[in-house]
Structures are given as C-alpha cells and as structure tokens.
Amino acid sequence: MRAVPSSPTIRPVPVAFSVKPTLIGERVLLRPFVDDDVAAFQAVLADPEVARLTGSPPGEGSDPGRLRAWYSSRNAQTDRLDLAVVDRATGACVGEVVLNEWDGPNRSCNFRTLIGPAGRDRGLGTEAVRLVVGYGFERLELHRISLEVFAFNPRARRVYEKVGFVAEGMLRQVLRDGGGWVDATVMSILAPEWAVHRGHPHS
C-alpha cells in the first residue's frame, strides 16, 4: 500500500505582523503611518527621480485620494509591515520601509524602501534598512529577506550592501526605461548572516 503523503505544514503569519512597532535609531525613527504623512508622500512621489528609481509610471502617486486610501490602510495589514521613515532632526516623514510578500513555509519576505529627496545622502536610508531588517529577523523570525534593485540605482545597491545584502543574480531587461531596457539585481540577506554581523558586515 502506498503511503499517503502528509500535507505540508503551513507556518501561519506571525502575530507580530499585526503589531506596527516604533523603531528608534540615532538619525531616524520608524513608526506607523499617520494622516499627515499623505501630504509628504504626495510630494515625494511627484519627484521625477523617485518615479524613475522605483519603476513607477509618471504621476502614479499624484492622486491625494488614492494615497490617503492606501496609507490609511497600512496599519491594518496583518501579513506585511509598512512603516514611515521619520528624520529625527526635523520630525519630517521622508520615506517608508516595507516587508511584504510573506512566504510562510519558507519564512521569507520581500523588502522595499523609498526615501525622498529630503532624506538622502545623510545615512537615513542605511539606518532605516538596518532597523527594519533587524526587526524582521529578531521579532518576525524571518529566515530570508530579499529585494530587487535596478541597475540605474547604484546608490540604493550600496546601501543594501552596507547592511549585508548579497547579490544573487540578475533579472535581465525587466523594466522599460525611455528607449531602452534595464536589468535588476536580486539581493538577499539570511538570518544566520544577520546573527553574525547585525547589519555591519564590513566592520
């Protein structure tokens, strides 16, 4: 008699995904979204460079009603974590960090971040990535966090490398950019790696 294969064990979504924490660093504070963030994101998403770096169609974030509906629903999500990035020096919301695409059996998530012009070139993005990746491994008990970064965004890739993300491979010509095509690099960081360097692999 053939044995009937057992059903795979599906790891439930962590309860911690329902908790939207406040994470405090030296330069940035990550917190749940508030109503006032909508105006900040409308300005950020209207920036042509932001639209290009994120692969978003021009004008996609210009509708305040759509933005308000989106960001007002982020704190209620139970299978992902969306947090606003706040510059502690000014109190301004300058971007966001997101852990999404939860894969229960493999304890993995996708990561993405968006930092507007007001938050660039001062280490805010690097610290924000470290804070949320650390939370993902230490509180959400993730095993793997992955991302994709476009070839025309070396600044973002350097940030990810500083935190310990490792390039795994290339997705060829995944984005139409003007008259050409752009590749993207797949990067990831694993829980055992984080346990060793805690976001400072080159220290």
Predicted regions and their residues:
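Amphipathic alpha-helical segments that line or abut small-molecule/effector binding pockets
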Residues: 39, 126-138
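GNAT-family acyltransferases
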Residues: 1-118, 181-182, 189-203
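Conserved hydrophobic/aromatic "anchor" residues
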Residues: 33, 135-137, 165
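Conserved GNAT acetyl-CoA-binding A-motif
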Residues: 138-148
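Conserved active-site alpha-helix within GNAT-family acetyltransferase domains
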Residues: 122, 126-127, 151-169
